[in-house]
A protein has these predicted regions:
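Structured C-terminal helix/loop/strand segments within mature extracytoplasmic catalytic/sensor domains
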Residues: 1-64, 80-92, 232-250, 282-330
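Second-shell loop/turn segments in exported
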Residues: 74-82, 117-125, 144-148, 156-160, ...
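Active-site SXXK
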Residues: 113, 123-148, 161, 301
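Active-site-proximal beta-strand/loop segments in catalytic clefts of secreted hydrolases
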Residues: 108-110, 162-166, 173-177, 191, ...
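Short glycine/serine- and small hydrophobic-enriched flexible loop segments
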Residues: 136-144, 223-230, 323, 327
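Mid-domain, small-residue-enriched loop/turn segments at the edges of structured enzyme/sensor domains
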Residues: 102, 175-232
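Conserved active-site loop region of the serine DD-peptidase/beta-lactamase
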Residues: 226-274
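A short, well-structured edge-of-sheet supersecondary motif
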Residues: 84-119, 291-292, 301
Length: 330
């Protein structure tokens, strides 16, 4: 565990890495305010909370999208003009050169099958985007023919974990699916090759749930997202649509990140993560992954950022980068 945490420390110490954006053919989420701070053992204070706080009373009572409704099919998105230019471009490189921290990102165009990567560096801590991995593992484990196979309890916990980023729900499901070993097995089937599930949930010297120290790369997060938006050998259609419906119903306060600059009419399914590394409020891991479809665009985007001096700073960085990508993907 100390090795994993140590790796996070090394990552967080860096400045913006050399920016490299490359295109390759073939296979490989409107910004908002930061999450609320809630009291409780798994709901850290505003000064240092993992990106998965338990919902505030108002949020816990908000209406949710009906679970029987299907998320729109990614393949049904407007075709538009297939983009051929680098979605990051000089503007992204110029912007990030003046920002603190290390940013890694990837974009996958579902219209063309082309992908681009930005930044260089080792895998970074997932924080609460690992909850998407937990959800997909759960769906793969429970799949029953063409259905999700989820129990009422599974659905309640999954909704809390994705829509409200609830830590307790995530911990319950982490154990329910079999922990790191089963998640690692699912990841191998899903094509993730650079993701290492955390070996502990209660980690020595770390105040928050240890699953947030799972490390990953933007490329692996694109592979995980593709399991939801393209025909998958590991997830039936009902499971994919269910996961996307949760990601589209994320509480408004957490709809920042890859949704930055995206018009309200566009479909955005996302999961974000925020984690104060080393128990301080000056070294934040801020991540965002998701699917954006509409306005002539249909793409996946994953952003990892570490070494942020504050939570909001990291959110602002990803919002701005996402807005650039949205414009250039048109």
């Amino acid at each position: 565990m100390l090795a994993v945490l140590g790796a996070c420390a090394v990552i967080a110490g860096g400045t913006v890495a050399g920016l490299a954006a490359t295109g390759s053919a073939g296979p490989a989420g409107t910004g908002g305010a930061p999450a609320r701070a809630i009291s409780g053992t798994s709901d850290p204070s505003a000064a240092a909370r993992l990106n998965a706080t338990s919902p505030a009373p108002a949020s816990s009572q908000r209406s949710r999208s009906p679970r029987s409704s299907s998320a729109p099919s990614p393949r049904a998105a407007p075709a538009g003009k297939a983009g051929h230019r680098d979605p990051f471009g000089p503007a992204a490189a110029s912007y990030l050169s003046g920002r603190a921290g290390t940013v890694l990102a990837a974009v996958y165009d579902l219209r063309t099958g082309r992908s681009w990567h930005l930044g260089q560096g080792p895998p970074q801590a997932e924080a609460s985007i690992v909850k998407l991995d937990v959800l997909e593992t759960l769906l793969a484990e429970r799949a029953d023919g063409d259905g999700t196979g989820l129990s009422a309890s599974d659905r309640t916990l999954a909704g809390q974990m994705i829509e409200d980023s609830d830590n307790d729900a995530a911990t319950s499901l982490w154990y329910a699916v079999g922990g790191a070993a089963r998640i690692r097995s699912f990841n191998a089937r899903a094509g993730l090759t650079h993701t290492a599930p955390s070996s502990c949930v209660i980690c020595p010297g770390f105040a928050w749930p240890g699953w947030g120290l799972t490390t990953t790369t933007p490329g692996d997060q694109i592979a995980l997202l593709r399991q939801l938006v393209t025909p998958s050998s590991v997830l039936p259609r009902a499971a994919r649509e269910y996961a996307l419906s949760l990601m589209q119903d994320v509480t408004p306060a957490q709809r920042w990140g890859v949704s930055g600059g995206v018009p309200a009419r566009v479909t955005v399914a996302l999961k974000n993560g925020w984690l104060p590394l080393h128990g301080t409020d000056s070294d934040w891991q801020i991540n965002s992954v998701g699917w954006i479809s509409g306005g002539g665009r249909n793409y996946l985007m994953a952003v990892l950022s570490t070494g942020n001096p504050s939570e909001q700073y990291g959110i602002d960085t990803i919002d701005e980068l996402a807005a650039t990508v949205w414009q250039r993907m048109g």
